[in-house]
Swiss-Prot record:
Disruption phenotype: Mutants have a wild-type piliation phenotype but are deficient in transformation. NCBIfam families: IV_pilin_GFxxxE (TIGR02532). Keywords: Cell inner membrane, Cell membrane, Cell outer membrane, Membrane, Methylation, Periplasm, Transmembrane, Transmembrane helix. InterPro entries: N_methyl_site, Pilin-like. It is a single-pass membrane protein. PROSITE patterns: PROKAR_NTER_METHYL. This is Pilin-like protein PilA3. Plays an essential role in natural DNA transformation but is not required for pilus biogenesis. The keyword Cell membrane applies. Residues 121-143 are annotated as: Disordered. Residues 1-4 form a propeptide. The chain crosses the membrane at residues 5-25.
């Protein structure tokens, strides 16, 4: 003879169902949180790497004077100094000039600037090519946001006389041969277990990570061969 479920059996089944649902909700919430944290950290690392790639490429080009395309060649004179900057703690500024063959002759001379507005790193890249002659001009910068959530663009310059400087000015008897660059930033959203509370830059500056944000830093050395003075005849 068939019989229905007793009240006790129904209550037990409901209790089991509630436990299973609670475990499922907790699992999916944990998975979603893990995905958000992973995405935030990945975006942070990609952003810092992008800034490092752009900055080191510009530094490597600083002082380049020649434009070449096929059989066409053009030498330009750059404003002096072709690389200048200020030591602003961990947020340095830069102004540099170079000639690139990746653009046509009418826009080969470039003026590039870096500076901060709060925690936003801004970059300017403007055409400094003269309408006639071979002397690159000094146009005003036109800064655009490059990356948000940046703690540092800290640069230490290795001079040809062996000294280390926090600005590109190595004096009259030396030139900046290379630069060690620290780029640091923080995640744009909060994460669980954010990691270290502070970071240290190449010049020894301590960076405090914002509460609840992951921080990430890269330090890289870049050679600047175009800044070596041309031999005098």
């Amino acid at each position: 003879m068939k019989r229905g479920f007793t009240l006790v059996e129904v209550l037990v089944a409901m209790a089991i169902l509630v436990v299973v649902l609670a475990v499922g909700v907790r699992y999916f919430a944990s998975t979603s949180e893990l995905a958000r944290n992973t995405q935030a950290r990945s975006e942070l690392q990609d952003r810092v790497r992008m800034v490092m790639q752009v900055v080191t490429a510009d530094l490597q080009m600083a002082g380049a004077r020649y434009w070449n395309s096929g059989n066409q060649n053009q030498a330009f004179s750059l404003p002096l100094p072709p690389l200048s900057g200020s030591n602003m703690g961990p947020k340095d500024t830069l102004t540099l000039y170079y000639v690139t063959s990746l653009r046509d002759l009418a826009s080969a001379c470039r003026r590039v600037d870096y500076g901060f507005e709060g925690d936003t790193l801004r970059r300017s890249d403007v055409n400094a090519t003269p309408s006639s002659g071979s002397d690159c001009t000094t146009p005003p910068p036109n800064s655009q946001p490059l990356a948000e959530g940046m703690l540092a663009l800290d640069i230490q310059y290795q001079c040809s006389d062996g000294s280390r400087k926090d600005t590109p000015d190595c004096g009259t008897d030396a030139y900046p041969r290379s630069a060690k660059v620290t780029v640091a930033g923080y995640s744009l959203t909060s994460v669980t277990n954010p990691g270290p509370a502070s970071l240290t830059t190449v010049t020894g500056k301590t960076l405090a990570c914002p509460q609840g944000r992951a921080c990430y830093a890269l330090t890289q050395e870049v050679l600047m061969p175009n800044l070596k003075p041309l031999p005098t005849p």
